[in-house]
UniProtKB/Swiss-Prot annotation:
Protein name: Protein RecA
Function per UniProt: Can catalyze the hydrolysis of ATP in the presence of single-stranded DNA, the ATP-dependent uptake of single-stranded DNA by duplex DNA, and the ATP-dependent hybridization of homologous single-stranded DNAs. It interacts with LexA causing its activation and leading to its autocatalytic cleavage.
SMART domains: AAA
UniProt keyword annotation of DNA repair present: yes
Record's subcellular location: Cytoplasm
Cross-referenced InterPro entries: AAA+_ATPase, DNA_recomb/repair_RecA, DNA_recomb/repair_RecA_CS, P-loop_NTPase, RecA-like_C, RecA-like_N, RecA_ATP-bd, RecA_C_sf
Superkingdom assignment: Bacteria
Matches recorded under Gene3D superfamilies: P-loop containing nucleotide triphosphate hydrolases
GO biological process: DNA recombination; DNA repair; SOS response
Protein source organism: Synechococcus sp. (strain CC9605)
Gene coding for it: recA
Length: 374
């Protein structure tokens, strides 16, 4: 490139004049559009993304701290996979810290007894059961703009039925009506969400695309707008049913972070959901204690500081319930190791490799135990 072109690429004005011009235009923009309409990224304390705990330590790790404040989150998965349970735990965490939460129950299926058993203060939880999708999203918009609500949950996108479809006859086609509704709503409320610091969680259902031969036929309802506007998308699946004998008492859930704009994506977290009790916090702690080496598992036995504390996972969790002081010490040690940079499956940058390593270790453990017995 010629030398004169290189020199022409830079501003010939002295740096003092450029700074003065920049300050003038910044002042003009703030006068026209309000304070905070433009800022230097390094000067903006609001640009630091704070988080809300999910209620599961493994999922908090996978998300980089929890659900981001002032962002849109989408949680999707098959039926009975734990979507609503996740949001109820988030509501409980917000209320514990003195925050205000709202639940927009478009499915008209909220169980207040179950919510209370998970720690939700149902007396102070704001609940709306809207008649139409437009009504639901308008309520969300007004709650967000009030800047007085910390968390809004919408259950679910699939149940946000457009007014035209409700007022029409059964069997009438309303092609793309829900997708247009969601697209308009996202354009309208996303800016307000960022300004207010309110987190909005949309639950979504899965559908199957017709005629897909190759690739994943699954898709979510409501069009593509939510996929783009969401800062975090979580794919939750039920991978195991927990049993005591023939009695089922819970499920093992796996969450994949399908999208994350505030932390590395594609991490995987697993945790237990107990029927009537929600996420097993002690189960999450035991998983992380084993992965960080605070608790050691040999065969079916778990040991802590050289002493056996339980045979089998369920007995070990029972021991942790009966010994809260030791459990608190274990949690402190686990958090210390995680702070120091210990890599576990939930915060691994190679989640698939970590999952394969864990699976291989699980398979080899019984073989080693049988060799030792022989």
């Amino acid at each position: 490139m010629p030398a004169d072109m290189k020199s022409g690429a830079s501003d010939p004005r002295p740096s003092g004049e450029r700074d003065k011009a920049l300050n003038l235009v910044l002042g003009q923009i703030e006068r026209n559009f309000g304070k905070g309409s433009i800022m230097r990224l390094g000067d903006a304390s609001r640009m630091r993304v704070e988080t809300i705990s999910t209620g599961a330590l493994t999922l908090d790790l996978a998300l980089g701290g929890g659900y981001p404040k002032g962002r849109v989150v989408e949680i999707y998965g098959p039926e009975s996979s734990g979507k609503t349970t996740l949001t109820l735990h988030a509501i409980a965490e917000v209320q514990k810290r003195g925050g205000v939460a709202a639940f927009v129950d478009a499915e008209h299926a909220l169980d207040p007894v179950y919510a209370a058993s998970l720690g939700v203060d149902v007396e102070n939880l704001l609940v709306s059961q809207p008649d139409t999708g437009e009504m639901a999203l308008e309520i969300v918009d007004q709650l967000v703009r009030s800047a007085a609500v910390d968390l809004v949950v919408v259950d679910s996108v699939a149940a946000l039925t457009p007014r035209a479809e409700i007022e029409g006859e059964m069997g009438d086609l309303a092609v793309g009506a829900q997708a247009r509704l969601m697209s308009q709503a996202m354009r309208k409320i996303t800016g307000n969400i960022g300004k207010s610091g309110c987190t909005v969680i949309f639950l979504n259902q899965l559908r199957l695309k017709i005629g897909v031969t190759y690739g994943n036929p699954e898709t979510t309802t409501g069009g593509n707008a939510l996929k783009f506007y969401a800062s975090v998308r979580l794919d939750i699946r039920r991978i195991q049913t927990l049993k005591k004998g023939t009695e089922e008492f819970g499920i093992r859930a796996k969450v994949k972070v399908a999208k994350n704009k505030v932390a590395p994506p594609f991490r995987i977290a697993e945790f237990d959901i107990l029927f009537g009790r929600g996420i097993s916090t002690l189960g999450c702690l035991l998983d992380l204690a084993e992965e960080t080496g605070v608790v050691v598992r040999k065969g079916a036995w778990y040991s802590y500081e050289g002493d056996n504390i339980g045979q089998g996972r369920d007995n070990t969790i029972s021991w942790m319930e009966e010994n809260p002081d030791a459990t608190a010490t274990i949690e402190t040690l686990v958090r210390q190791k995680l702070t120091e940079g210990s890599e576990v499956k939930a915060n691994s940058m190679r989640p698939l490799a970590a999952a394969a390593k864990t699976a291989a270790a699980d398979k080899s453990a019984p073989a080693k135990a049988s060799e030792a017995a022989a």
